[in-house]
Amino acid sequence: TGNSNHNGFKYGLTWMAYRPIHETECCIGNLHRYMPNYVARMWLKDKKGHPVAALYGPSSVVYDLGEGVTVKIDEITQYPFEEQVKFKFTFFKDGKRSADSHQMDFTYRIPGWCKAAESGFHTESKEWKSGDVFTVRLPMQIEVVDAPVQGKCIQRGPIVYSYAIPTNWMEDTKIYDNLAGKVSANPEFKSWELTPAGKWNYALVENMLRGLRVQRTGNSGFPFDLESVPVKIRVPVKGVKDWTLKEDRFTPALPETVVPESDQVEFIELVPYGSTTLRLTTFPTVKE
């Protein structure tokens, strides 16, 4: 919210709220840059000008291989939610689809999180022809990861998973002194106060975390909309006693001593971090 004060740097204030206007404009202005930067770096060239698949996602690209030969590559995948990445090649000679074979180096990258193969760039150098398909499989294991200070997180492949806390949305029309009177110039681009509308104070049941499985929802649509997430992970939890909202505004540090509300084990669904707004990502732990 606009009055959050749990950030050690200037104690948060509007820095911790969902709003289009920020005290320092470069923060809001830079926040969205990761996506076009990711897309711009998905496909690179090696020294010969041949294709390098550096970052994965559904895409198509055309490379000029010289001497009138071009190759169109269709990348077919649901990465980062699924393990398989397929590349389908179509070659053209002087603008017409080619039935001939063509020598080409195709380089792909194994991400550092993938333990099934040596990370880094690998090259497949051979004769290719139209219709060839090259498949990269990146096994994604569900991992329980220690957070830097305290608590544990759930990660699968490149994605960290969070509990999407039920949320009350309230428009924030207050004009804050630290913003020097700045307000959004677009009435449809509003400032929001988000507060919990349901239970959030959960601890992972540590000795029940083996054998976690991903649940595929079959949803289509934008995968980072909460209603459309393609994958979920169901985890065992217990409610934590006396872990409450400090000043009714934000989640405090994890409790050093976790006292369960009861012996009852509940199950909650975690979704990709990027599909949440108000979230619990780092959990305290408790025994069954």
Model-assigned labels for residue ranges:
Residues P80, A99-S101, E127-K129:
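Surface-exposed coil/turn segments at beta-strand junctions on protein surfaces, enriched
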Residues V85-K88, M104-Y108, K129-L138:
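Short, well-structured beta-strand segments within conserved domains
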Residues A116-V133, P139-P148:
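A surface-exposed beta-strand-loop module
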Residues T1-E82, K88, R97-S98, R137-E288:
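C-terminal beta-rich recognition modules with glycine/proline-rich loops and embedded aromatic residues
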Residues F89, D100-S119:
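Beta-strand-rich binding/interaction modules
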